[in-house]
């Protein structure tokens, strides 16, 4: 039985990991497409219009792959978690249905109009079509994260005598504190991925001395949006999410921070390897008191460690949760450093000559995908109840 449960989890983890490669690009890319089209309306410079159409074609391919990989994921709710689907379908079925009804049709309809309907629509309606694709993309994220937020922090429901969960407060479901903070964090993370992809394509064009005009446009746009998103994904949205994890899932919070013992003046671990046998961190590098400060804005406050919780309430794989969180934070720090340096050179008007930095930006794009996936691993590996 335990083996079958593990296999079900591994199968679902593989399916949803592969699926999320695609939405994390489309959600952020839709905003950049709207920006390019808006810039064209303001300046009438044709390169912005062509950039918008070019990236919408990339969006369409990723959107299609997202749909194809998302269908088996929904099937696996029934095949792998049949009892969960039976009992909670009255709630999660509604949010998933709204995602399909509102978001999917909004995106799929206006993608075609944007790619092929420029001459028919005129530029203002063409911009509106792009904006509606963006709206559908972000609404899709909202409904999916609403589903996940209910699983993280169940609200707005009652349990019937037959054990079924039914929704009794629609607005409470969509004002779930977990939903609001997770959505903002997720969208900034998606914008990081799309910004690095756009910037990396621009860097590649410049390095190859091909389509230099568009290479400079893509690189400049990716750097500006990437720096903005890289900062916001850590503060305030990442800070908000960590505090919500502490409030709602304190055992998972202790595990991801590598805090084995309850402490006043709790330290923030930078590096270290969890030793589950000894219940400690090996080769630890930490900042004293800083975890208490980030959590409560006071250095001497108490943070519960894993020793404060029964073993059955702890995440099943503490090292994986710990490493996922710390690698994600480490990559986020690298993103800020690289984008800040690139923005500095952009301000100095010599970014396009920095070949070493262009190589770094180009090669970092896959790591933006990895950081996004690790963020979801952190959310799901420690999820309660």
Model-derived regions: residue spans:
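Polytopic transmembrane helical bundles with strong interfacial aromatic enrichment
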Residues: 1-385
